[in-house]
Amino acid sequence: MTGRAAAPEFLPIVLALTTRDKGRELLRRAFTRRRTKLLLVRTAEAAGATLRTTLVDAVVVDLCAGGDDAWAVAALARQLPSIPFFALVAPRLADAAVLGRSAALEVTDLLIEGVDDAALRELVVPQAFTARFAAALRGAHAPLGLEAPLQQRAWEYVVSAGGRPVRTDAIARALDVTREHLSRSFATSGAPNLKRVIDLVRLIAAAELAKNPGYDLADVATVLGFASPSHLANTAYRVAGIRTASLTRLRTRDLLTRFCQGRSRSRV
């Protein structure tokens, strides 16, 4: 077994609305298939449907052509504050009016076409939902008693998924160990079971998304890949002893505390 870090297999998902060929070409060059999953849509309806069914890491709205749909999608930034929204504008549009309207809609940043082209990915991806989620939880393994190198590497892999479903065999492959060795070694010295930890991280992501006005609990269950809202409810009770309605007010610290109070072990 090596000491290298796990290699996450989760590409950031960027949703982009544009009606221009030039806009699509620019976005495809910036967010290549090898490094990003780019979802291109042309209408506000399609963007809204995607946001309700997929855990999107960032949204880029092409304002260069204007139009009601573009501003309608930009307005979703206030409804989904966990997801960063970026406005792609031409230099001639980067005036006080556009800046003021974008700021009022709580758009994360402006991307200037022709100026920021080569740096679009570097400007967007570090602020993506999954990147910020993983960074916020990177040190949260300590209260769980995950101090061994293998435990920490597995933890980093799990949080890198941003709350998406994670299989133990995928973690084992990334860490270059067998699934049996991983499960056995992870839960040593009273540490929680790996499967339970995966559920905890998914519940923390659900709590983050549930605080967004634009999501109801059914939406949260869908975007995080739970089989149904009932599946999310069962996970919330099993992991933290709570009802899903409590997710809108509980912080990560609260969920970690409840998890450590006797709910960190599962049958395997």
Predicted features along the sequence, with ranges:
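Conserved acidic segment of CheY-like receiver
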Residues: 9-22, 27-31, 39-40, 47, ...
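Acidic, metal-coordinating helix/loop segments flanking the phosphotransfer/catalytic sites
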Residues: 42-58, 65-66
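Conserved phosphotransfer microenvironments
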Residues: 57-85, 89-98
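Receiver (REC) domain switch/output surface
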Residues: 98, 109, 115-133
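Short, Lys/Arg-enriched, Trp-marked, Pro/Gly-tolerant hinge/linker segments that flank
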Residues: 127-156, 164, 188-194
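Basic, amphipathic alpha-helical hairpins
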Residues: 153-167, 186, 190, 207-216, ...
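Basic/polar phosphate-binding segments, predominantly the helix-turn-helix DNA-binding elements
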Residues: 169-196, 223-243
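…primarily DNA-binding HTH/wHTH and HhH modules…
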Residues: 230, 234-268
